[in-house]
């Protein structure tokens, strides 16, 4: 529940920044332009500074966005994902047939742009990913290299010829990772239920504990972004 609220808050502020750069600044500049054409003589210092800085930010943002989108088209590729359909979250989706009352399972096919694996450990692309997050620009998913090493079984043999294969292995293991962890937690609960209460102090030391490292948290974030139910 806490993770869901945190993801919603993160998305909220992402769209706030996106609205500032893509909507608010352009509206301010448009209103000032209309005000000028209306015949008002606005020669004050504050007005001129506001006009200049608003125009400068818009030009800078537009230029950066065009450069980044061109870079994304070269350095990333589209990957198709099949997401499970969740009735409680998807009632606002318009369907051509009745999926809500059907007993069989349904899936939604989506596409995501993912940076090629060769850029995962590049400091430049890590900074680009953070810059896009700050500016509210939708960027391809950058899979951290430590996750690729853990889930893709990569050592030092990543090349342009085999990165597609490693991406497939990484995404497959990324999808299965949470299930394996949940199985471990369920096994722990079964051990606790079947154990004698008098011997809990001895058995607790034998129950496998799931320790969430920073890598595990990053894996959960990627799972939420790529495989979360629609």
Curated annotation (Swiss-Prot):
Question: Superkingdom of the source?
Answer: Viruses
Q: Does the keyword Kinase apply?
A: no
Cell compartment(s), UniProt: Membrane
How does the record say this protein sits in the membrane? Multi-pass membrane protein
Coiled coil location: 172-196
GO CC list: membrane
TM stretches of this protein: 19-39, 55-75
Q: Where is this region: Disordered?
A: 178-205
Q: Which keywords, in A-to-Z order, does the entry hold?
A: Coiled coil, Glycoprotein, Membrane, Transmembrane, Transmembrane helix
Segments of skewed composition (Basic and acidic residues): 191-201
Bias kind Acidic residues: ranges:
180-190
Q: Which residues are glycosylated?
A: 41, 86, 157, 168, 182
Report the protein name in the record.
Uncharacterized protein R455
> Which species?
Acanthamoeba polyphaga mimivirus (APMV)
The record lists the lineage as: Viruses, Varidnaviria, Bamfordvirae, Nucleocytoviricota, Megaviricetes
């Amino acid at each position: 529940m806490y993770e869901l609220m945190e993801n919603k808050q993160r998305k909220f502020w992402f769209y706030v920044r996106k609205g500032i750069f893509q909507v608010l600044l352009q509206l301010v500049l448009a209103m000032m332009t209309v005000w000028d054409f209306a015949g008002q003589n606005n020669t004050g210092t504050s007005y001129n500074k506001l006009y200049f800085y608003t125009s400068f930010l818009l030009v800078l943002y537009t230029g950066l966005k065009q450069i980044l989108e061109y870079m994304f088209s070269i350095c990333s590729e589209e990957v198709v994902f099949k997401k499970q359909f969740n009735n409680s979250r998807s009632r606002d989706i318009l369907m051509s047939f009745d999926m809500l009352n059907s007993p069989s399972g349904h899936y939604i096919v989506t596409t995501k742009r993912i940076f090629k694996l060769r850029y995962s450990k590049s400091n430049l692309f890590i900074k680009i990913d953070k810059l896009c997050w700050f500016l509210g620009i939708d960027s391809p998913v950058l899979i951290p290299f430590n996750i690729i090493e853990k889930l893709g079984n990569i050592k030092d043999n990543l090349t342009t010829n085999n990165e597609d294969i490693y991406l497939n292995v990484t995404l497959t293991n990324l999808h299965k990772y949470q299930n394996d962890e949940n199985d471990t937690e369920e096994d722990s609960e079964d051990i606790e239920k079947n154990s004698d209460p008098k011997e809990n102090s001895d058995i607790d030391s034998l129950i496998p504990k799931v320790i969430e490292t920073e890598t595990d948290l990053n894996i959960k974030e990627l799972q939420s972004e790529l495989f979360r139910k629609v």
